[in-house]
Every structure is written in structure tokens, then in C-alpha cells.
Amino acid sequence: MSRWRVAARLARQSLFSRDHPVRFIFYLHELVLRLPVGGPAVMADQLHHLQRMSLRPHRTLRVVPAALGVHAAINGSFLLMEFAEFRPVVYLEAETSSLFLETPAEIEAYQRILAMLGEVALGEEESRERIAALATELYADREDHDDRL
């Protein structure tokens, strides 16, 4: 990953610590929570980090169950950014480029996807429970496993 992308992601994280933080809703497919990245200790830490972050104000994390199968949002991640003073924008990021979508038809398509995700995703508490269950299922046999938030 390029340095500017890392810098951009870190800058986005700073939105959480503002005096008036931005409201975020995250939808994560259950399978991404199962995808091993960086080894078992890293994955266990990441799952517990998600649990902790989901408890903070202005952040909602909802898990889309794997049992639902393929759905409209399976094509990749996106950000729908809505502003008080400006029209909404969708941001797409690929390996070597990024794209902003601004036309009403494009925005409506992504709003429909989010509405569908809102209907099928687990609720906030259920999502935290699912993440905890995955951490236990996948990593509980490790000596360094700790279920505490």
C-alpha cells in the first residue's frame, strides 16, 4: 500500500477524535472477519479492536451474516459520505486508483445497497456478539487469547 494511502487512512481515523465527531456506520461481511490476515494473534487483536471501537459513540458496526450468501454489496467496499451543506458523494478505492461518484443515479444506487444492508445485517449488539463468538471460535485455543474488551 502506498504511503499516501496510509496517510489518507490515518487522516480519516482522526475524524473520530474531533470535538464534533462524524457519525459512521460500518457494514462488515462476516467472511472478512474470518479471513486470516497477519496470523492468529493479529486477527484476535483485530476482532477485539472492532468490538471496542463499536462501543464508542458515533460509530455503528453491523455484521452481514455469511448465511445470507451473495448480495449487492459483495462487489467491494465503498463510502457514502453525506454532508449538511453539500450533495452526497460515493468514494470507491481500488488497488491503484480511487473514484468519486456524484450523479444522483449513482448515489441512489449506493443508497439502495445501504438500505438493503440495513435490513439484513445483524443489530449492533448481535454484531458485537458475533465478533466475540468468532474470536473465541477461531482463536480461543491460543495461550495469548483474551476475551476481555
Q: Model regions: which residues?
A:
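Hydrophobic protein-protein interaction segments
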Residues: M1-L149
